[in-house]
Regions:
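Short loop/turn segments that connect beta-strands within beta-propeller blades
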Residues: 50-52, 92-95, 168-172, 219-223, ...
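Short, solvent-exposed loop/turn segments at conserved positions within beta-propeller repeat blades
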Residues: 37-42, 81-85, 155-161, 206-213, ...
Length: 640
């Protein structure tokens, strides 16, 4: 079997966006592949015949992203888009090709068949020819009036406006329901009778986006609008049940700050709400397990047949649960659920494991319907528990391919981002590349990670203390448990929060022979004003701000301690990273350079905070080549 190599990301099929037909005979999904020649990703739409257990490509279009089954089980999908129109095609379930069904003079980002002769559409305006010309003429400057003023993966966000529309199938007319000028539409739902909309609106006080939203009911018949819950929650998503009540997932952020785990609530149309998930159901909603082998969108919540379905991260798994109309919670599927579609008597879902990326399964027979097994050699992942700061924490060791217990191996401590995400035992391409080249990889989920409740994940004001202790205790334990770890040839690396911790570690210990800090935070005081989340994330996480308690914020900043760095450290950053902007890495690079310590920095043009997960193929390959080159130069162990 061939080794897992850096370029293997070009061979992977990433399945996502799972939908099921009304007659429950077909599934539809996207298959995304990296395209090195065009340096992008191609997403193809597929149908899956459940009875025949076969998949069919719907279109040769490489950029399909929006699709639905209509009430007659035809596939409706956006085939193409130009300066004037978005073009939607229709295809039945035969092997024939699709045909143009309608076109809309908007940039459509959402479509839902209301089954009453209308589609519900979310869209923004296309620029007119004069507007495009003016935009080009004025491209040498930007006007900034909002906070945040940019957003990672989007860029400057000053005048991006969305609206909701009804599209009439019969005459193909478009009727605006509402636009959103001075507020953001963060979530919405329509009731069964299609006469009421529930809107989660993010208000912008003085053009500053606030953290808590308003829940608004819009009557589509009389156009009346009413705020029923004002400035109370940060919402994840919401749905109408069959009784015209609203089920929503939200956090009031009063116990654990912005990273507090949410709960499930129910409200009537007057805003009388109650919590319907138990107080001890302290789990992180959504799949926060890290991997560099997934792509596109995944479903977290769904309502069907009087049941609310939701994915949570619990321990080191992403599990699918349901909540029925009697408020009983049931575990439906364990493991790592990536996406799901609900049938009347079955659940279809994409899962990930240690040797398979997103593959299609069904719950009823626990059967793989569409396999996606990694066809290269994989190192073995072993798990163990260690104690740190009063908790028993799971640790992972990925052993090299052809592991020999009588040898010593260079070892990398890998640190995840977040901090409220986590590692698991699922496939991680980057880790396996190192394991296939003679490295041991060790990783864990220190305090601050998700999956263990709000008390465990809440490290506000403790950055660089309890989490640092966990990582060092874990490293010590791993060395004792695995004498094959060459403790004189160890490296440390991570991105985002993992980059922050890498910065912190090299400022506080010399035990690692080399380090690689990616898309990191180094200075909370400057991060506050330049990150798309800085103005609220930095005060929340540090318990300080630059004006009232500067020293507290400064003390938690790695750059404050960077004069101590002796570890050769390489930095990777993207120049369009607006989450952890480039200047954060440059500050550490500058100080370490002044220390006379070996350092270098790679800046990736046109990439953002997602470089390692969804960056353009050439950039992802080059990034991993440079990381490996750096560690090989310092750690590569040779038998003497």
């Amino acid at each position: 079997m061939e080794k897992t190599k850096i370029n293997d990301i070009l061979t992977y099929d990433f399945y996502s966006s799972l939908e099921i037909s009304n007659d429950e005979k077909y599934l539809a999904f996207l298959k995304t592949n990296a395209d090195l020649d065009e340096n992008k990703y191609n997403s193809y739409l597929y149908l899956f015949d459940i009875e025949k257990n076969k998949k069919y490509k719907v279109s040769d279009n490489k950029n399909i992203g929006i699709f639905i089954f209509d009430e007659n089980d035809n596939l409706i999908y956006k085939e193409k888009s130009d300066d004037k129109f978005d073009y939607f095609y229709k295809k039945d379930k035969s092997m024939g090709v699709g045909s143009l069904e309608f076109k809309i003079d908007k940039n459509v980002s959402y479509i839902k068949d209301l089954k009453n002769g209308y589609y519900l559409i979310k869209a923004s305006d296309k620029l007119s020819e004069d507007e495009r010309k003016k935009q080009k003429e004025n491209s040498f400057y930007k006007e900034v009036t909002k906070l945040p003023f940019w957003f990672n993966g989007t860029g400057y966000i000053n005048n991006q406006k969305q609206s909701l529309y009804l599209f009439k199938k019969e005459d193909k007319s478009l009727q605006k329901i509402r636009n959103f000028e001075n507020e953001s539409l963060n979530a919405f739902a329509i009731n069964k009778n299609a006469n009421k909309l529930a809107l989660v609106l993010g208000k912008n006080d003085n053009k500053v986006s606030r953290l808590r939203d308003d829940l608004v009911i819009l009557d589509l018949e009389n156009k009346e609008e009413k705020i029923i819950i004002e400035n109370e929650f940060s919402y994840y998503d919401l749905f109408f049940n069959d009784k015209d009540e609203i089920i929503f997932v939200a956090s009031d952020m009063r116990k654990g700050g912005i990273n507090e785990d949410a709960f499930i609530y129910k409200t009537n149309l007057t805003g009388e709400y109650k919590k319907i998930s138990p107080d001890d159901f302290d789990k992180s909603f959504g799949n926060s397990i890290g991997s560099d082998a997934r792509h596109e969108a995944y479903r977290t919540f769904f309502y069907k047949n009087n049941k609310f379905y939701f994915v949570v991260t619990e321990k080191e798994e992403s599990k699918l649960y349901s909540l029925d109309e009697n408020e009983n919670i049931k575990l439906e599927i364990s493991g790592c659920v990536e996406d799901f579609a609900i049938a009347n008597d079955n659940i279809y879902y994409f899962a990930m494991t240690e040797d398979r990326i997103s593959h299609l399964k069904e719950k009823k027979n626990n059967k793989i319907l569409l396999d996606n097994k990694i066809n290269s050699s994989l190192g073995t992942i072993e798990e163990f528990f260690y104690e740190s700061n009063g908790d028993k924490i799971r640790g992972y060791v990925l052993l090299p391919v052809d592991f020999d217990k009588n040898k010593k191996y260079p070892t990398l401590l890998s640190i995840h981002g977040g901090p409220k995400t986590e590692f698991s035992n699922i496939f991680h391409h980057e880790h396996q590349v190192f394991a296939n080249d003679g490295y041991i990889i060790i990783y864990t989920n220190p305090h601050g990670s998700s999956g263990n409740g709000v008390k465990y994940s809440d490290i506000r004001g403790k950055y660089g203390t309890i989490d640092y202790e966990d990582l060092m205790n874990f490293t010590d334990f791993a060395i004792k448990k695995y004498p094959q770890i060459d403790e004189n040839n160890m490296g440390v690396y991570g991105g985002s929060y993992g980059g922050f911790m890498t910065n912190w570690i090299v400022c506080h210990t010399d035990r690692f022979k080399a380090a690689n800090s990616q898309r990191s935070i180094s200075n909370w005081t400057s991060f506050y004003g330049v990150s798309d989340i800085g103005y609220y994330f930095a005060p929340d996480q540090t318990g300080a701000n630059p004006w009232d308690n500067l020293e507290k914020m400064w003390e938690q900043s790695p750059i404050k301690h960077a004069k101590n760095v002796k570890t050769p450290t390489m930095f990777i950053h993207s120049d369009e990273d607006y989450r952890c902007p480039l200047e954060q890495g440059l500050q550490m690079y500058t100080r370490i350079k002044e220390n006379g310590v070996d350092t270098k920095m790679y800046i990736f043009h046109g990439e953002n905070h997602e470089l390692s997960r969804s960056g353009k193929p050439k950039a992802r390959i080059k990034r991993l080549e440079k990381i490996k080159e750096w560690f090989d130069g310092y750690l590569k162990w040779k038998e003497k």
